[in-house]
Amino acid sequence: MTNIRKTHPLIKIINHSFIDLPAPSNISAWWNFGSLLGICLIIQILTGLFLAMHYTSDTMTAFSSVTHICRDVNYGWLIRYMHANGASMFFICLFLHVGRGLYYGSYTYFETWNIGVILLFAVMATAFMGYVLPWGQMSFWGATVITNLLSAIPYIGTTLVEWIWGGFSVDKATLTRFFAFHFILPFIITALVMVHLLFLHETGSNNPSGLISDSDKIPFHPYYTIKDILGILLLILVLMILVLFSPDLLGDPDNYTPANPLNTPPHIKPEWYFLFAYAILRSIPNKLGGVLALVLSILILMLFPILHMSKQRSMMFRPLSQCMFWILVADLFTLTWIGGQPVEYPFIIIGQLASILYFMIILLILPAISLFENKLLKW
């Protein structure tokens, strides 16, 4: 009798993706983040679904409905904080996943990589709109500031902003549509994830050495299923420690004040995972220039396959490139810190220098070092 796992039209797809998938024998823990992101997405969709059952997307009742969830709904506080901190875990995994791709040259699978960058944009858009929903002070002013950036687009800017707002300011119409988009986007993300995996399984996984591993493959199950389960348990452990011991650690106290259009908070800043991009935005004195830099700071990831000058794929055997990679990581930490600071000396100049360094490392220094390493190896 033939195995149903290998013959059934639906189960067969799952089999080829998660069970009999040939995987390189030497992929490290850095390859765990794909599955962890999948788990994060599932957690976010499930907790979000239960929150949506009790949330009302109306300016008069949104803030109260979130309070009601935390106080009156059974385990509502748990669902709410799992959703809020789940977003932070999502972005930690995302940044590590992208960083792994940069370090080991996974961007040479350019279809997979480009879908990944689109996914990053989609997740960032979803997180931004989700942050607006509790309708606290930072929700309202964050939405006002970020949507207002679109007015920098020449000719159509102002019309575009008013069209997105559904009026002349962030109001009831804006909140309702943000809730609608925040609800639908995770399902679009799920579809994109499937495309991401489809492209990945066309080529197979990369590995730390960056060499072709066709001659040494092992089945995904049981080797990598058990490894993924360990990663998932650690992810849930960290998430639950965050949720149960310090749920507000990564949030902003201003968001516990209901939105008030007549009172601007002293420091408007987004959630921690957007601070690096926010710092790049603020480091340019011109509005349109800042918006372009903001978009390019993420879009620049799509240039990595073109900017790859080395004859080797991975950075595993390239110490000079490794050094530059870690300087880039340190630079991103610096930008994240600056994004949370007020706009005054010395933070302004530090932010500007860190922004220049960010683009210089990616566009000039890394490709130049790669060419130099080729020369050193007489390639």
Curated annotation (Swiss-Prot):
Annotated binding of a ubiquinone, by residue: H201
GO biological process: mitochondrial electron transport, ubiquinol to cytochrome c
Keyword Repeat: no
Subcellular location: Mitochondrion inner membrane
Note on cofactor: Binds 2 heme b groups non-covalently.
Transmembrane segments: 33-53, 77-98, 113-133, 178-198, 226-246, 288-308, 320-340, 347-367
Other observations noted: Heme 1 (or BL or b562) is low-potential and absorbs at about 562 nm, and heme 2 (or BH or b566) is high-potential and absorbs at about 566 nm.
Functional summary from the UniProt entry: Component of the ubiquinol-cytochrome c reductase complex (complex III or cytochrome b-c1 complex) that is part of the mitochondrial respiratory chain. The b-c1 complex mediates electron transfer from ubiquinol to cytochrome c. Contributes to the generation of a proton gradient across the mitochondrial membrane that is then used for ATP synthesis.
Self-association state and partner proteins as the record states: The cytochrome bc1 complex contains 11 subunits: 3 respiratory subunits (MT-CYB, CYC1 and UQCRFS1), 2 core proteins (UQCRC1 and UQCRC2) and 6 low-molecular weight proteins (UQCRH/QCR6, UQCRB/QCR7, UQCRQ/QCR8, UQCR10/QCR9, UQCR11/QCR10 and a cleavage product of UQCRFS1). This cytochrome bc1 complex then forms a dimer.
Family: Belongs to the cytochrome b family.
Name recorded for this polypeptide: Cytochrome b
Lineage: Eukaryota, Metazoa, Chordata, Craniata, Vertebrata
